Amino acid sequence: AGNGYNFYEAYLWVKQADKGLMDRPVNYERAQWEWNSDMYVPQYPSASWLESIGRLGSDRPVVPSEYAHAMGNSTGGLWDQWKAIYQYPNLQGGYIWDWVDQGILVKDENGREYWAYGGDFGTNMPSDGNFCCNGIVNPDRNPHPAMSEVKYAHQNVAFEATDLANGKFNVLNRFYFTNLKKYMISYEVKENDKVVRRGKVSLDVAPQEKK
């Protein structure tokens, strides 16, 4: 819809109506860098753009309204984006398009079940083809392979090898309020896909710290 007078007035009304209740931030993608959005919410910025705006800084949080499209064989660039997001505090995440495939469970003439979409409901029916099947999980919430990439990028504990020969790692606690001593960490060491060592360790690492 773009931006303009009505959106300016709507922003001011929301701020007044919400005052003293929750004082929630407002975001409106098409406002871009104008004053009637409390965060900058672009669509599909590249990893290099996120790196650039993170390094330069911004007058408000940057939270892409869409930054990864989970349709088909996708989300391969997610980690490149999250490396920048984790590095710069003005980058505060983003929204994946989207969570779940929007298919409907039906049966074919042989009784086999499948997820129907688009043209499955007739050639003369309105259809966006398979564009409604763009989630990281199936309609029954079974995960797509893309879910593994999302899980890795969003994990709250990260490990970085500092001296592999001597088994030394840095452990980063990405939680904001939880010490890692609340968890028991299990690990395995593999050689040619065979487990040669396994163990458990408890670590005292404060939120947003590494050890």
What are these regions (language model features)?
Residues 1-170, 175-181, 186-195:
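Extended substrate-binding grooves/exosites of carbohydrate-active enzymes
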Residues 199-201:
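Short hydrophobic alpha-helix segments
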Residues 203-210:
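Short proline/glycine- and polar residue-rich coil/turn motifs
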